[in-house]
Structure formats: C-alpha cells, structure tokens
C-alpha cells in the first residue's frame, strides 16, 4: 500500500522517523509484553461506589489512604484494566459477545477491531445485550466473569501489552466494587490475544523500537 502524508486524506498512518517504517494503523502489530515477576500481595475486592468510569475509579483510588500504591506513586489510568464488550456478527447473522481487555489509558480502535474480526462485523453492545447476559455488571466488568470457561461464557481476549505477572485494578463484577492487585496468570486467564487498542504517537516502532509519529 502506498502511503503519503497529506493534510486531507482517507486514512491515518504511523511513521517512524528513525528507520522509515510506515503503515496504516490497522496494520501495526504490537509485540507480546514480556512476563513480569509477581510483586503484589493477594488480590482484594474493595468498595468503590459511583466509579463506573476509569476517571472516577482513579480519583477514588488516590483519595483513600487504604488503597494507596505500595510504591508510593499515584494511581493512573494505565494501572487499570478496562474490559470492553462488543457484539460480533458473523456472516450468517449469528451474534456472539466478545470481551476485550485493554489498559485503561487506551481505547479500542474500531478500525483495528473491524480488521481483526473480518469477515465478521461488529456492533455496539446494547442494554438489551446486558439484560441477556446477567453475569455482566455494566461499569464494573472484570475478568472473573469473562472467558469461555467463566460464568458469562463470553470469549475474553487481551491486549498484547498486558504482561503475564502484571497487576491491575479492574471490575469485581459487582455494582460499586473493584478488585485490586489482580494478576494476569495468577488470578485470571484469557482465551487469547487481540491487538486492537489505539496506536498513539510515541508508541514503539514495531521495526526498530523508536518512537513513532502519527
């Protein structure tokens, strides 16, 4: 595919100023994060009322001393695990929920997701879908309810940036509650990996590791 920068164009692409790598955002591939040593205590569920968004969760987590980080730093959105639910529509019309876990400071890129599931299509997960999947608590969805072997039976795929051994704040599948120090590989598993999170300026070039431009 030929790519050339222009003020008005039909696509967004990534370019590395160091090695010259260029690709549209759908074609970018993020390598799997290396395993990390588990460095946190056992996971614990905390009452976090009125925190259905990442911003409110981070604010509450930093305002309560008992929820402070072990290293003394402040919590940020990147410490949270956001679980996004969409409906995958196959060519024959069959609909299947799909759960995607991404770091809380990133969004799922719709174009990348569409490319990843093609020829299936994607539609938004609506209120009627939550009603049909009572294991999902809107605003507080966590890995405990997800996965083909979980209580919801919903396929659960993780962003490749999420390393085995990494710890997260995420939903506890109960209204107004989140779980802290939940470790991937120790406390929960996923059904696979999907690389559909937004690509941002400053991300590592998949070719040489330098910071890319958008």
Per-region residue spans from a language model:
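Extended, low-hydrophobicity, polar/charged segments
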Residues: 1-214
